[in-house]
Every structure is written in structure tokens, then in C-alpha cells.
Curated annotation (Swiss-Prot):
CDD domains: Gnk2-like. It comes from the Eukaryota. Residues 1-27 form the signal peptide. This is Cysteine-rich repeat secretory protein 9. Residues 251-286 are annotated as: Disordered.
Amino acid sequence: MARIIITLTIPLFYFFFFSLLSHQTMSQPDHIFTVCNPTNNFTQTSSYETNRDTLLASLRESSSLGHYSNATEGLSPDTVHGMFLCRGDITTASCVDCVQTATTEIASNCTLNKRAVIYYDECMVRYSNVSFSSELEIVPSITIYSLRSAPNPTRFNQTLTEKFSELIFNVSSSSLVPYFVEDQERVTQSEGSYDLDTMVQCSPDLDIFNCTVCLRVAFFRISTCCGLPSYAKIFTPKCLLRFQTSVLLSPPPSPSAPPPRSPPPKSSPPSSLPQTPSPPLVFTPPQNVPNPSGSFSFNVLKGNVIFGRIVVTMTALVFALVDL
């Protein structure tokens, strides 16, 4: 399992839970992280709590109808706004499962917080006492990437830039809802070939301009923070972006030129002596060494494999102390 780095960008006054679960079953959504805003709280049994729980129940019901939904519950000052967004390439059943899990966990982890967001690999759920519909938001965000470098970094950077420019144009100019585009391409170069899988997605409440800005900022972060890794993904409240490369496949060896033909042997004059046949080639094992019983051993040099070890780096953007 490749070692990975996780980078969080969140305002300083947030607290968060995150996990990268290596032993989850296939039926469980993959939890990435949860961010709660502790500066805006409500009391138990308050109207806000009732509205929050009603909102989350409404999102659960809507998850069977599509990959995106938003909702508003209650009257001011206890109004709660919420949304969910499922990844565009998962099934409706997976979306329902993720949203049901996320709405339960976000209420459990952020018990009395008026604002919170929870990210899974398959979906995102959030709620807030402030309306965020159609608003461009970049934080809180999380970036996950591998420490395995991409093949031929200089050319890979050019390939990746061209590919995401194409995807961002396609997703922002598409009428599909939600904005979602994925692509797979076989990239061939002198060192060999590899498969490049790419994906971009925006929240459908964004207009074309803000969708483009969100994805370009996400790509800038992922391409400058991580040293061109072979795998990376970034989650923000309004868009997500990811890429992955397969193992580099070596090019087939060039056909070698056939060796020059040997000149025909010179005929020797007949000899009057009788010809003695050459003795057959016989391999004789060294004496006093027992014959092996068919087993053998050899040394294998393995790469450094670190299982379940995660390095976490937190960066606080001075200019990004915005509300969730």
C-alpha cells in the first residue's frame, strides 16, 4: 500500500475528525473527514436542533431521487440550510447508503454545532445556519495524495494541465446535472505507457463561472502542493477533483539485428586415423553435497511499504478565515 499525505486547509477556529480506514468492508462508505464549527452552537432540545434533524431526514429521503439536493428548514433565527452531493460515477444505491451514513454521523460528531460538513469518498453532506447556495467556497478543503511520483514529471505536468483544462471546459459547459466529467486515457512516452484516470465535479448550485473558478483553484492547489504524485484528490465544499495513474508499462524491447552468419567450416583432408566420438556432456554434482529435494530459496528486494501510516499537515490560510 502506497504511503500517502493528507493536507487540510481549514480556518483555525474549526475542529475536525478524519480517518482513512484501511479495513472497511465494501458496503461501508469511506469516511474522509468531518469539520465542525465550534464558534456557533445551539442548545439541546432547541428549535435549531429540531430543524437540523428534520433537514437531515429530508436529505436522506431525497438521496434516492438524484445525486444532489439542497433543502431549508425552519424560520429565522433558527433556519437551517443543508445539501448533499454524491460523486457522479456511483450508483443511486451507493449514494443513498452514503447520504444515510453521513447524515447520521454529522449529527453525532457535531452534536451542538450550527455549522458542519462531512466528507466521504462517495459523497459530501453539510448544514449551516447561513445560506450557502450559489456561493463559491474553497475551504475547508482536504487534499490526499500518494508519495509515488508520476512518470516523467516534466511531461506529466504538461499532460495533466492539458487534460484538466479540457475537463474543466467540458464540465462547465455541459448541461448535465450535477456537473461531472471523467476520462481515461492511455499515455505513451519514451519510458513506456500508463493509464491516466481523471475526474472533476461541481455542485450544481454553482453557475458556470464559479464552477470553473472552483476547479481551477483546486487544480492549482493539487498541482503545486504535492510534487506531481501518481495519485491525488482534493475535496472542497463546492467541487472535487482527482487523478490517478497506473504503473508505468515498459515499452517492448526493440528487435535486435540477427548475428552475422558464421562462415562455413573448412573441410579437412581425410585422416587415416579412426575418428573417436566426443564424450557426452555430463553434469556431475560436487562431492559431499546432498542433492536438494526440489526446493530453493532466493532474496527479494521489496520496496518500502508503509501500511496505515499517515502524515497530516495542517495549513491555515490567513486570507481564508471564512465561515462554513
